[in-house]
Amino acid sequence: LPVFAGWVLSYDKPILLVLEDQCHLERAVRYLIRAGYDWIVGYLKGGVEGFYNAGFPTEHMELLTVHQLKAKIDRGEELTILDDRGQDEWDQGHIKGAKHIYVGHIPERMSDIPKDKPVAMFCNVGHRAGLGASILLREGCREVYNVLGSMTAWKAAGYPITTE
C-alpha cells in the first residue's frame, strides 16, 4: 500500500478501503494519511468476499498462465505484452516483442497502449501486473490479462527471453 498508493489514488477523490481483515485497517489508514491521502470515507466490511456475498455487481480481469501466453504468441494472435517491471529488471531479460512501461508510468502513457486490442500484463511474479491490469481496465481497455507468475514462471518453463 505505501508503495502503490501514489500510482493509483488521487488526493481529490474519496477513498474506500477494501480489506479482507479489519485488523489491517488502522495500518492502512496510517500509511495513507502519512502520504497525504486523508479523504478516507470508510472500508468495505468483509472485504471482496463480503461484496460478493451482498450480491453487488463485480468486474474481474482474466488470468493467463505462461503456457497459455506462449501458445497465443506461437499462434500469432494479436496481443500486446506489456511488461511493467523496472528498467533494471527489463534489461536483465524480457519477452521478445513486449512493450515496456513501468507500472507507475502507465496512467500517463495510456496513449501508447491499445484500448481495443488484447493486452497481457507481465511483471516479475504477477503482483505489479495485477495492478497494471487494474489501471488498464479503469482506463477503458477491454481485454486485459494478468499473466500468473509472469517472468518467474516464464523462465521456470524454459521459454526464451531477450536482452535486446
Which functions belong to the PLM regions below?
Residues 1-80, 84-164:
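Rhodanese-like catalytic fold shared by cysteine-dependent sulfurtransferases
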